[in-house]
């Protein structure tokens, strides 16, 4: 049994969280979509990630990887040159399209293809202007403070 949530009350009191609500809606509908090819998403360190897709039967030139704004898309399409007669076909060669939503400042650094495994490296690079910084406090120091002589009343 699936449960759906109504986010309408939150829309009235939040500003700028549109993308978050879209991601939650997409996650609720994720159970109905195809999960081919199988994949792993790993955190390698604080700011490094890796997506591994099992694409046995495909070659590197039959796979396209595109990063557009905050969405990473991996598409594969076999180029069948000759018809084969299979007695049993257990390795799928159907076309696929997998999309991954990327967080802010996450960029694709590279991809490699080896032994039927496509690995995509991701790095989160926060701009210097967005990183926390220490602010110095200016003003009078203890050496500049003068005490005024006062008489007790």
Curated annotation (Swiss-Prot):
The keyword Cell inner membrane does not apply. Keywords: Stress response. Residues 30-140 form the sHSP domain. It comes from the Bacteria. The keyword Aminoacyl-tRNA synthetase does not apply. GO terms for cellular component: cytoplasm. InterPro entries: A-crystallin/Hsp20_dom, ACD_IbpA/B, HSP20-like_chaperone. Pfam families: HSP20. Belongs to the small heat shock protein (HSP20) family. This is Small heat shock protein HspB.
């Amino acid at each position: 049994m699936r449960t759906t949530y109504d986010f309408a009350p939150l829309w009235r009191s939040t500003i700028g969280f549109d993308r978050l609500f879209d991601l939650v809606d997409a996650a609720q509908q994720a159970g109905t979509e195809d999960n081919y090819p199988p994949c792993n998403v790993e955190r390698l360190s604080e700011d490094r990630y890796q997506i591994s897709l099992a694409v046995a039967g495909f070659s590197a030139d039959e796979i396209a990887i595109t990063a557009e704004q905050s969405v990473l898309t991996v598409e594969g399409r076999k180029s069948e040159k000759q018809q084969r007669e299979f007695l049993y076909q257990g390795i799928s060669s159907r076309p696929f399209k997998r999309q991954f939503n990327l967080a802010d400042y996450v960029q694709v650094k590279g991809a490699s293809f080896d032994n039927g495994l496509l690995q995509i490296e991701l790095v989160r690079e926060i701009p210097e202007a967005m990183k926390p910084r220490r602010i110095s406090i200016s003003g009078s120091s203890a050496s500049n403070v003068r005490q005024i002589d006062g008489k007790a009343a």
